[in-house]
Amino acid sequence: MANNTLHRYLFEDLSVRGELVQLDDAYQQIISSKEYPKPVQNLLGELLVATTLLTATLKFEGSITLQLQGNGPVSLVVINGDNDQKVRGVARFEGEIADDATLHQLMGKGYLVITISPKDGERYQGVVALEGKDLAECFEGYFERSEQLKTRLWLRLGEFEGKPHAAGMLLQVMPDGTGSSDDFEHLEQLTDTVKNEELFSLEAEDVLYRLYNQDKVQLFEPQNVEFFCGCSRERSGGAIITIERSEVDDIIATEGKVSLHCDYCGTSYDFDSIDVAHLFEEATKGNDTVH
């Protein structure tokens, strides 16, 4: 099957649109950057699926960042995705976490922060209290309040062929106002029957046929979803030269090197005294050229 793909579709006679995302490698790369407990892996997976589904609604170049913030053992979960479906994510946690911990046990009193950042235009940010029984319910509440559109999400995590998989579906009434609540409930009931194994193993066309073969469904071209953190040695060097040279020299005197670690992909970039001298020398040359 085609993994790491997002599919959009439309129910031609019912004024309802849908999305289906199936992820394996993109999800696995995010959770492999640290030794995350299983419940934290699941939170990252659910937020990743939700981010992918939401970025599909963007009608412009830009990005969406979803953050879970709380005062529980998990203080932060962040997923960022853009209109090209390049995604990355990280989580912060402390202490022992029970394998069966719920969303509220993990996050404590928490919030879902949704930040939409167009390439051109003003940034939008919405904050939603984590009041639903699960993450999908929190997102549904957000859509109902912010867009006044009936929306349902299904966020699924699990193992398939020995590897972690993540998948999800979204149904939303079209904003033209012609969709009926009965039609939407009919599609909800059908989608509720989808099994994890089907989402992890079947092609999108087969999943949709299994669920909606009595309805007319228009399936659009899929979009690939790709893990992309954006870190590089050059960017890390650029960060070092923003620090006072004396502070950098003190670190090298103590540690023997300056190390920068990318939380998104787990890569570390090390700079010794020769590297640092070269960085500051090049920065000085650049400043002289400007003046």
From Swiss-Prot:
Protein name (Swiss-Prot/TrEMBL): 33 kDa chaperonin
Family according to the record: Belongs to the HSP33 family.
Residues spanning the signal sequence: none
GO cellular component: cytoplasm
Record-annotated disulphide pairs: C229-C231, C262-C265
Cited InterPro entries: Heat_shock_Hsp33, Heat_shock_Hsp33_C, Heat_shock_Hsp33_N, Hsp33_helix_hairpin_bin_dom_sf
Domain of life: Bacteria
Species, as recorded: Aliivibrio salmonicida (strain LFI1238)
Protein location: Cytoplasm
GO terms assigned for molecular function: protein folding chaperone; unfolded protein binding
Function: Redox regulated molecular chaperone. Protects both thermally unfolding and oxidatively damaged proteins from irreversible aggregation. Plays an important role in the bacterial defense system toward oxidative stress.
Changes after translation: Under oxidizing conditions two disulfide bonds are formed involving the reactive cysteines. Under reducing conditions zinc is bound to the reactive cysteines and the protein is inactive.
Xref: HAMAP family: HslO (MF_00117)
